[in-house]
């Protein structure tokens, strides 16, 4: 994460405490921007500030890195399940500008998902299980490593715009398979979400970048590798794959493994892509991967259109999303 000047909204001692209401951000006359960046401490990094930094620096080319593959011992993780109830992380309703209804998940017709047998190969090695702790519950999402210590996921996985509260803790486990893992488990120490996600729950803003601490001296991306992000405009009729950790399949099997499938982007608008790939709660935050395994969007949930058709979908990697993610890295 590059250095920027912060507009501090509240002072806290520890990272990853619940966020509070950001009333000032709702007034665009005060100079706020939908892609202003808010971190886990409630500090705001203004859009114009990080864009100046991006404009004056040479952005590194997004490259695929498969990681060292170093085998690390499993670590003792907090047992959230023992003390707190499970929280189904359902996306909020969209903004008034998006006339679609949204559900947490959709299995469309016959379930076409398959289990991933080998998560030691890319891109499955970079797809990660994220276990989340809230003040009164726990849950999980999916994310994808995009740098040595950064993960891309959904905004609703870390901040609930209805309550304005954030997670109190989280761990990221790359390549979790049959409830075992080889590449370490990494504590989330910070996160970055768009201010408009906190203020409105806008579907097109439902993404987040997580920052990870090293585990026994190793960074997650150095060990498991990371996926490149690809800026896009139109991806209709392109093939994408969406893999993650769906709760229905995990509960049926009794073990945590990756599931997913490939298909075609059937509809899109300027900021969202829609496809009839089957997903379920727990796959929130999964990457939309193109045929080159580049990230072109972030899966969010199920959408039902006014014509009655059901799709899954989420934010595309349009320029402001791409810029936000690059700045957060």
Task: Label the predicted regions.
Residues 149, 153:
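Cytochrome P450 catalytic-core helices
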Residues 296, 300-329:
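C-terminal cap/linker of serine protease catalytic domains
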Residues 2-24:
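Sec-dependent N-terminal signal peptides of Gram-positive bacterial secreted proteins and lipoproteins
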Residues 132-133, 154-157, 173-176, 211-214, ...:
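Active-site-proximal beta-strand/loop segments in catalytic clefts of secreted hydrolases
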Residues 102-125, 129-140, 159, 165-218:
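Conserved catalytic-core segment of clan PA serine endopeptidases
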Residues 278-299:
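Catalytic nucleophile loop of clan PA
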Residues 24-142:
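Protease-domain processing segments flanking chymotrypsin-fold serine proteases, especially trypsin-like
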Residues 203-279, 309, 315-318:
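Chymotrypsin/trypsin-fold serine protease catalytic domain
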């Amino acid at each position: 994460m590059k250095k920027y000047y912060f507009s501090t909204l509240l002072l806290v001692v520890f990272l990853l405490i619940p966020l509070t209401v950001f009333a000032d951000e709702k007034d665009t006359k005060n100079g706020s921007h939908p892609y202003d960046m808010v971190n886990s401490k409630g500090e705001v990094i203004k859009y114009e500030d990080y864009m100046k930094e991006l404009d004056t620096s040479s952005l590194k080319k997004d490259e695929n890195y498969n990681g060292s593959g170093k085998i690390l011992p499993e670590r003792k993780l907090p047992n959230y399940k023992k003390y707190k109830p499970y929280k189904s992380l359902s996306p909020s309703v969209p903004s008034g500008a998006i006339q679609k209804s949204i559900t947490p998940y959709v299995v469309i017709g016959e379930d076409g998902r398959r289990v991933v047998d080998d998560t030691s190969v890319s891109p499955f090695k970079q797809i990660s299980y994220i276990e989340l702790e809230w003040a009164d519950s726990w849950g999980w999402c999916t994310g994808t490593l995009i740098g040595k210590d950064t993960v891309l996921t959904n905004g609703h996985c870390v901040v609930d715009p209805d309550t304005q509260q954030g997670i109190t803790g989280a761990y990221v486990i790359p390549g979790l398979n049959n409830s075992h893992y080889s590449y370490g488990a990494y504590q989330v120490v910070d996160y970055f979400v768009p201010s408009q996600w906190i203020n409105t729950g806008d579907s097109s803003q439902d993404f987040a970048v997580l920052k990870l601490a090293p585990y026994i001296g190793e960074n997650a991306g150095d060990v498991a590798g990371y996926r490149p992000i690809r800026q896009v405009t139109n991806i209709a009729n392109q093939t994408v794959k969406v893999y993650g950790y769906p709760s229905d399949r995990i509960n049926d099997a009794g073990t945590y493994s990756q599931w997913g499938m490939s298909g075609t982007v059937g509809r899109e608008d300027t900021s969202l892509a829609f496809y009839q790939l089957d997903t379920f709660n727990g796959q929130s935050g999964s990457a939309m991967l193109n045929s080159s395994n580049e990230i072109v969007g972030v899966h969010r949930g199920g959408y039902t259109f006014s014509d009655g058709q059901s799709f899954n979908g989420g934010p595309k990697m349009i320029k402001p999303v791409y810029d936000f993610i690059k700045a957060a890295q």
